[in-house]
Every structure is written in C-alpha cells, then in structure tokens.
Amino acid sequence: MIKDYKVSIAIPIALLILSILLIGFKGIPKSIDITGGTEITIKVNENMDITPLKESLNGIAEVKKLESADGYYIVIRCKNEDVDIVKQKIKEFFHVDSLDKLNYSEKTIGATLSSKFFEEGFKAVGFAFMFMAIVVYLYFRNPVPSGAIILSALSDIIMALGAMSLLGIELSSATIAALLMVIGYSVDSDILLTTRVLKRLTKSFDETVKEAMKTGLTMTLTTITAMLILLIVVKLFIPVADILANIATVLILALIADIINTWLLNAGILKYYITEYRAKKI
C-alpha cells in the first residue's frame, strides 16, 4: 500500500502549503452574510438579457441570473449605502415606477451584525476543533497517532478553504456551518484507520490499512455521492437555495481532501510510527 512513507506524507503537505498560499495571496471571497449588504432577488418568467442591468450597475453591485424549473431569478448584491441607487437602476431596467410591481424579495444584513457573526462563527469552528483534538488525545493517549489525526483534520479544513479561494466560493454562514460539519466528517476515517493499525499489530501494516480503507472509503464516497446529488438537485431545480449548494460544495471539497489526508498523510505518519519510531522505543 505505502512503499515510502516520506512520499506519502510529502504529497498532502505540498497541497496544504499550496492551500495556505492561495488563502494568503488570493484570499477568500465573502458573502453579504460576512461583509454586510443587501441582496435583491427578482423572479422573472422569461430568459431576459441582463447585460444592460450589469453595465448600469458596474462597480456598484454584483448581478447574476439563475435558471430553475419554475423560471428565472435575477440576483443583485450591493453595499447597504448603494441600495437606493441600485433600486433606481432596477426600476429603470424593468420600466416600472415601484419595485412592488415586480416579484422580488430583499435581504439586508448590517455591517455590525455580519462582523459579529463572522467572529462568532470562527470561534465556534475553533472551539469545535479544540475539543475534537482533546477527545482524540484522551482516547489514544499517544502524541504521534493523535497528532496525525489532528493534523489530518486541520489539513482538511485548510484545503477546503484553499479550494474555496481557487474556485471563488464565498465564505458565508452556510460555508462556516459546512466547515463545522467537516470536523466531524474528517476525523471518523482517521480514527478508524488509527484504531485498526494500533489494535492489529500482529498483522502487516499494509494489510491492516487495506482493510480499513475498504470501510473508510465506502463511508466517505457515500457521503460525497449524497452531497453530489443534493448539489445537482439544487442547481437544476432550486438555484436560489444557494445555502444548500454551498454546504454541499464545501463538504465535497473537504471530503476529497479527507481522502488524501487520511490515506496518505495519516497513513504515512502511522507507518513511520509503527516501523521506525515505535521500533526504536522497543
């Protein structure tokens, strides 16, 4: 399974460093949940050309069109201070004197509330990760296997954030919730692998990892499949439910990262621990 643990560890570490560089230099786009602002959603029955609206709101607001089974949706996002200008441009585009004549909805989040949510959201992620790390250490009571699990889980989160930066997925209330879910999803296969390896020392390392991989990959791929189905359904039938789409996307990215980190990084560290570190102690 793992011929050279150094190569096995190096691949996910390289991806981890790349993710950190992406986050540091490119950043992660933030939704109005984080930055504060107004989102106006207008339902229309025909496929309209929104290029004139985009041009009139260039530099003021973000405009996009979504298609679903029951029609089309035009979504406009802007800063709270620009909302009056944006509404005026919308009225001019649709040739109406009031937005009440349109099938529209409006969501506004203040800057203070959004910054507070951002702060509390990441506190929740931090505390969840810390308590997970404590539980893992108390269970295994060994710094090397415990550290491997914690490093793998941390790498899952950072790689997911790096993928969000690369793909332009916004950091929002939904994606922060997804990151919280990632902590739970990411450690199960790591704990499965570590428990199997440490409790079956009479078997060869590669044989034990292969057995654990069958169960672990089945669990992970089942979840990825479920999230893919959710993502496809949302994109095709309810595109305005972008919260569900964002959660599904982040979980898929994180679970792909988890496959790499569990079966290369964690397994590589465990092979070093069993074949070299532990052997020297004995």
UniProtKB/Swiss-Prot annotation:
GO CC entries: plasma membrane
Organism taxonomic ancestry: Archaea, Methanobacteriati, Methanobacteriota, Methanomada group, Methanococci
UniProt name for this protein: Protein-export membrane protein SecF
One example of a Gene Ontology biological process annotation: protein transport
TM stretches of this protein: 9-29, 120-140, 149-169, 174-194, 214-234, 236-256
Function: Involved in protein export.
Location in or out of the cell: Cell membrane
InterPro entries linked to this entry: SecD/SecF_arch_bac, SecD/SecF_CS, SecD_SecF_C, SecF_arc
